[in-house]
Design a protein with these regions (language model features):
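Carbohydrate-interacting regions of secretory-pathway proteins
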Residues: 1-140
């Protein structure tokens, strides 16, 4: 299914090794070569992989110092994507409130939500997700 404006909530727990990270891609383009999707990066700030908003560069580093994420525990992530505005809460604390000025049109089109895992430093790592819920926001 493709989503345009929505709120996604989920719990995650992630490996604490090195630069290993995971992520949630928003409105991911389905055709190759169009461009990158918004990604809510899920990682360890101490390793340079904070929970924050990434496109082809960091748009907002969010929990850069790991002040909100709880290592080795379940963490609650809530993501709201309405038009060019992306908001993220980690454990009920707002960590990203970003409005993309003049984004490429493809970033505002409906697309799938994708979960990602990304090994680093030769380490496969792991991530677990649970309690996922998506609420679609209807256009007014």
């Amino acid at each position: 299914k493709h989503f345009k404006d929505f709120e996604l909530s989920l719990d995650f727990k992630i490996d604490e090794h090195g630069k290993y990270n995971s992520g949630v891609f928003l409105r991911r383009p389905t055709k190759k070569g169009i461009g990158p999707a918004y990604q809510i990066n899920i990682g360890r700030g101490a390793a340079g992989e904070p929970v924050g908003l990434y496109l082809d560069q960091w748009l907002h580093k969010g929990d850069e110092k790991d002040a909100v994420r709880k290592p080795r525990e379940w963490n609650r992530l809530r993501i709201r994507a309405i038009g060019p505005c992306i908001q993220v809460w980690l454990n009920e604390k707002s960590i990203v409130d970003f409005t993309h000025k003049n984004p490429p049109a493809y970033l505002l089109k409906p697309g799938p939500i994708a979960l990602q895992t990304y090994g680093a430093e030769g380490h496969n790592g792991w991530v677990q997700f649970r309690r996922m819920q998506i609420i679609e926001w209807k256009e007014q």
